[in-house]
Amino acid sequence: MKKIILALIFAYIFVAAPAQQGEMRCRLGFSYEFSSNNHWGKDKPVIMKVYPNSPAEVAGIRQNDIIEKINSLKVADITMDDVDSLLTASEDSHILLTVHNFSNSEREVPLTKECYSNLSLNENQLAAAFSMYSVEDTHDRLFFCPFVTTTTEDAIDFSQFKTFDFSLVEEDKSTLRIETVLNEVLKTELTKKGLSVNALNPDMMIHTYYTFDRNPNFRKKSKATEEQPPVFRYDITRDKVTKFPFYSPSTPESEAEYVLQLGIRFIDQRIMPGRVLWECEANELMSASYSLEEYASIHIPLMCMQFPYVKYNRNVQFILTKKAYNYTGINYNIYRINEVVSIDPGSPAAEAGIRPHDIIERIDGKRMDYTAPEFTAAYRQFITNTLKLRDSETRFTDANGFVGRMFWDSFKYSQIAKAFAKDNNLTAFSYLYAFQPFVNPERSTSCTFDIRRDGERLSVVVRPVFHSEKTIELN
């Protein structure tokens, strides 16, 4: 799906072509591409991403699943356009996929599309539209890893390989400790993909190799190397983006104080014993010492994202997508933003008694009687006026190319909260991030919606549910 630049999402929504009353938009909750890979799903759709809290995730669809059939039609017998039409047809709310992966040669997965009125705007979309209210919670971030990934030139289907085991570890205690860590991480990642350990007769043998030491060829750093921007990557062990002591891959090796190499080989034991099926190698140039075990724990999951479906042969690009927000279940009218179009069944707003066609006059005392362009203009002005309250040390370029993404300065939370409280900033939708102290210093767990219904004014207290989503995908 084509990405819309986040800072313009809100404006974009309201300049799109008018939706027809009663029309619906639906989603299954995954993206896919047609494979040209001889080892996985050749000429068939392969699932590239499964969206959090979507029908696909609930049904158990997984990344790298190969779609074999749609509503019992074999994808090999229809065109790419037919596949697109069958998956996106708005008149069909139910669909039956037959998928293929390591665990199953074929598995039928019934899916029910999640459908909304074309007139509605949900809180997931609003969280993205107002992401600068809390970049800490909602952003897309691009990062690179210097991996080189190669596969056998033989046209062999990797799904034939179901089991694995590890090469014998060395007797040396320090090496045994390192390989134990590497093998445990690999075991976790491969079992997630549906493979299993078989020590007696494995289909694949996994071999790891590694080195880490001071660089014997180090001479002197140039000014350009000393002034390189820091390298940030996602640290799965800490669940956050972290700064690492790595240099750019283009740095001359003689200017790096330390070097690290980590490689993984999957070796055929089933069809042609000894043949290397898949290999991924990381080579890092480093400015400081770093634990090989820690490197492996963070980077092996990223390396394994290219098995069995390889997209990049070198310098792999990843996107971390993070979104956390307060969910009430209210869906707003795109063209009359303070009108409720619908309420998600069983949601906090439904339980509190908010109904479709209610007019929201205020949220936590903040007025809602403005047009969408007025909200958009005020949001942009808010971003400009509060730049001085952000921490410049956290500046990063997001996955859409915006260079000025920054977190709030933790020493200025009281000033930030005052900016959110100003009436002329039109920050009613900051309730989406009211769990943060820079939005809501009292950290209250409820929101008050002042509504108008058939001429009657009501005050309704809603207790939102915290929704959190995070995905890492190949770009």
Task: Specify the residue positions occupied by each region the protein language model found.
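Conserved PDZ fold ligand-binding element
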Residues: 56-79, 349-379, 383-390, 417-420
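C-terminal/domain-edge helix-coil "capping" segments
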Residues: 104-105, 114-153, 276, 283-335, ...
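Surface-exposed short loop/turn segments
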Residues: 22-23, 38, 209-273, 432
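Bacterial Sec-dependent N-terminal signal peptides
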Residues: 1-24
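PDZ/PDZ-like peptide-tail recognition elements
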Residues: 20-49, 86-88, 297-344, 350, ...
